[in-house]
């Protein structure tokens, strides 16, 4: 019996490469036994709406082609529903954090091959208040880097654009008095930022969570206490090597449930996009989504980053 697949794609991602390649993608999937149709997003929220509609129409497979923002929208369209379809991913963004974590190829046809081969892995996702995320949630000025970095700069220098913007923002950073409750522990004090990670790759930092596991039901919680400019620059340098976890101003914990509050405004970042402001309640949904992954990589290699 032929499987029904629905492609949801951002036509502007990757310099419109997927849009131009779509006819070949449809032919390849058709030959592999998939009855496939496609939907192009036009504005924020379209991918969420279409993903929910596709689920109601009983598609077996959803394929998200775009950056981490497109993938996040698709997840938000299906996360609350039963009988969720399997998820295929074609990484077309600047950084593609989740795709990196799953070792997915960035070549379009190679990514389609991963879906055709049919090897799947169940992964955790996070819930923040009423919305979902698949890679990270964070708070603090530095976490605004991903959505404040100019698109033109990202297109020119790729992921390095985030480093440039990050160092540019360092002098502006201010600590916020914050309360973070996680499982049976509490952090209360001044912090520059906090971050909840589901994978090892965030804004191009592939070693930010060096011991990330994608299916264990735990977030990695990183809290950076108030620090001076030199200390913060040092922490960022250490983070590029995965050595920040031992810095005295860095708290590195594992938790299933986290609650964050403050009397001061703090913006939130969810999968690289603006996520509102505190307070935030975060819950890890263990092995909630089934995604296609390369079959020449063992699950343990994906899960134990």
Curated annotation (Swiss-Prot):
GO terms for biological process: phospholipid biosynthetic process. Its cofactor is Mg(2+). PROSITE patterns: DAGK (PS50146). Its EC number is 2.7.1.107. Mg(2+) binds at residues 213, 216, 218. The active site is at 273 (proton acceptor). It catalyses: a 1,2-diacyl-sn-glycerol + ATP = a 1,2-diacyl-sn-glycero-3-phosphate + ADP + H(+). Pfam families: DAGK_cat, YegS_C. The keyword Translocase does not apply. It comes from the Bacteria. ATP binds at residues 10-14, 41, 67-73, 94. Homodimer. This is Diacylglycerol kinase. It comes from Staphylococcus saprophyticus subsp. saprophyticus (strain ATCC 15305 / DSM 20229 / NCIMB 8711 / NCTC 7292 / S-41).
């Amino acid at each position: 019996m032929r499987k029904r697949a629905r492609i949801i794609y951002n036509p502007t991602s990757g310099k419109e490469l997927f849009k131009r390649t779509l006819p070949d993608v449809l032919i390849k999937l058709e030959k592999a036994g998939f009855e496939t149709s496609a939907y192009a997003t036009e504005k924020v929220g379209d991918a969420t709406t279409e993903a929910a509609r596709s689920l109601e129409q009983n598609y077996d497979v959803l394929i998200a082609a775009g950056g981490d923002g497109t993938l996040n929208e698709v997840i938000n369209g299906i996360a609350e529903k039963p009988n969720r379809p399997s998820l295929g991913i074609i990484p077309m963004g600047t950084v593609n954090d989740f795709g990196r974590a799953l070792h997915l190829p960035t070549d379009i046809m190679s990514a389609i091959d991963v879906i055709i081969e049919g090897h799947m892995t169940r992964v955790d996702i996070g819930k923040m208040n009423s919305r979902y995320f698949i890679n990270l949630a964070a708070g603090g000025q530095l976490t605004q880097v991903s959505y404040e970095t100019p698109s033109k700069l990202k297109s020119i220098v790729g992921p390095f654009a985030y480093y440039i913007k990050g160092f540019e923002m360092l002098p502006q950073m201010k600590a916020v008095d914050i309360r973070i409750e996680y499982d049976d522990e509490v952090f209360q004090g001044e912090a520059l930022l906090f971050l909840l990670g589901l994978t090892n790759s965030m804004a191009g930092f592939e070693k930010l969570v060096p011991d990330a596991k994608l299916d264990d039901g735990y977030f990695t919680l990183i809290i950076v206490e108030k620090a001076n400019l030199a200390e913060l620059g040092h922490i960022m340098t250490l983070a590029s090597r995965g050595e920040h976890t031992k810095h005295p101003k860095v708290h590195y914990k594992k938790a299933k449930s986290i609650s964050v509050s403050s009397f001061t405004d703090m913006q939130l970042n969810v999968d690289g996009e603006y996520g509102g402001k505190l307070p935030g309640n975060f819950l890890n949904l263990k092995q909630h989504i089934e995604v296609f992954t390369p079959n020449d990589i063992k699950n343990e290699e994906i899960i134990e980053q």
